[in-house]
Amino acid sequence: MTTKRKAYVRPMPSTWWKKLPFYRFYMLREGTAVPAVWFSLELMYGVFALKHGPETWADFVGFLQNPVVLILNLIVLAAALLHTKTWFELAPKAANIIVKGEKMGPEPVIKGLWAVTAVVTAVVLFVALFW
């Protein structure tokens, strides 16, 4: 049986996400995908510049030294750190770790993830700068 009645659809303003801080932060976190796209394009440009020889690589390095690009890269870094922070805070909620019959709190897991991140970053920087 079909009906000709129109279903009620509650009006939803386009600014619905601005009402609660939780939704604003959610939109900010999801917005970190946009700077990730910029970084991906920049990385691909660098790979192709590396492939095409020293002159193209020098052009790429000059591009990276542009003040606008430096500011964009700082924004990308901030977005990546925010995204990392939210994922590290989510990780303990996804795994129940039981030590000596008691559930472990989220702090050791989060601190461990940050420690691993710091160690890997230090190793990569050491290899890149001094190897």
Curated annotation (Swiss-Prot):
Localization recorded for this chain is:
Cell inner membrane
Q: How does it sit in the membrane?
A: Multi-pass membrane protein
GO cellular component terms given for this protein: fumarate reductase complex; plasma membrane
Residue ranges spanning the membrane: these are: 60-80, 110-130
Q: Name one Pfam family in it.
A: Fumarate_red_C
Q: Sorted alphabetically, which keywords does the UniProt record give?
A: Cell inner membrane, Cell membrane, Membrane, Transmembrane, Transmembrane helix
Against InterPro entries, the record matches this protein to: Fumarate_red_C (IPR003510), SQR/QFR_C/D (IPR034804)
At the top level of its lineage, which domain of life is listed? Bacteria
Where is this protein primarily located? Answer: membrane
Molecular function per GO: succinate dehydrogenase activity
The UniProt record lists the keyword Cell membrane: yes
Family statement drawn from the similarity comment of this UniProt entry:
Belongs to the FrdC family.
Please give the NCBIfam families that the UniProt record associates with this protein: PRK04987.1 (NF003445)
Its quaternary organisation is: Part of an enzyme complex containing four subunits: a flavoprotein (FrdA), an iron-sulfur protein (FrdB), and two hydrophobic anchor proteins (FrdC and FrdD).
- Its job: Two distinct, membrane-bound, FAD-containing enzymes are responsible for the catalysis of fumarate and succinate interconversion; fumarate reductase is used in anaerobic growth, and succinate dehydrogenase is used in aerobic growth. Anchors the catalytic components of the fumarate reductase complex to the cell inner membrane, binds quinones.
What is this protein called in UniProt? Fumarate reductase subunit C
The gene name reads frdC
